[in-house]
Amino acid sequence: TPDSFYADSRKQTEVAIEERIQAILSEGGQIIDLGGYSSRPDAAEVSPEEEMKRLAFALKILNTHYPDVTLSVDTFRADVARRCVEEYGVAIINDISGGELDAGMFETVARLHVPYIMMHMRGTPQTMQQHTDYADIMEEIMLYFARKVRQLRLLGVNDIILDPGFGFSKTVDQNYTLMGHLREFKDFGLPLLVGVSRKSMIYKYLGGTPADSLNGTTVLNTIALLNGTDILRVHDVKAAVEAVKLVSKTFNFQLSTFNC
């Protein structure tokens, strides 16, 4: 996307995309996650046609030069997800809305037989920060996932990954409440994905900007790993891979990294 909150993740030319992919793979990234619609707070609306155009441009490059790379697409639109899987071989659907913004998403994922990353968010990227009033944030998100996991399983979808949605319809304090209770999400018996890379929960608390937030990101990634996180969604692959390796070495278990 041209308007991602982190400038270094905005890759729009063929050369820039190829250079970024080469860097990700050389640093140990395992999955490439592509988005054509910025999900930052107050992001501009993007039409389905424009979103698909942006994704297709990058996917064609990946299919041509990196045919063996595992691809994920970040979209809340069922038809965009379908086209990415059927036309470009995308392996994973990453939906920030958990099916809330497109009623056809769950059935589409069921037909496509691909893993589904389900995130918690209220509202839309444009309105989500107006919806941070929770009586009990952990209870609400646990109930949200319980309801949606049940719906997906009734449709035959069992390959589900949970993402609590750091920074999406949550205040800074609420984000840290989630971080402190991450292990509770393991009660579902499903993989847990965490994406905190350079987000405002870091630089609004510590001061600075997204560009200043790598150290904070690494600390939170480490806390997440120690509390049951299976997949990290990151910008800075090398730092994340090193965190994974050190935690894995210390506690002798296997973890994954997930790049954006």
Regions found by a protein language model. Name each.
Residues 4-20, 39-63, 70, 76-78, ...:
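Active-site-adjacent loop and "lid" segments of alpha/beta metabolic enzymes
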Residues 25-26, 30, 146-160:
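Phosphate/pyrophosphate-binding loops at sites that engage ATP/ADP/AMP, CoA/4′-phosphopantetheine
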Residues 29, 70, 90-91, 159-161:
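Hydrophobic "anchor" residues on beta-strands that sit immediately upstream
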Residues 35-39, 161:
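Short, basic/glycine-rich phosphate-binding loops at helix/coil junctions
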Residues 159-169:
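Conserved strand-turn element in the central/C-terminal portion of the radical SAM core barrel
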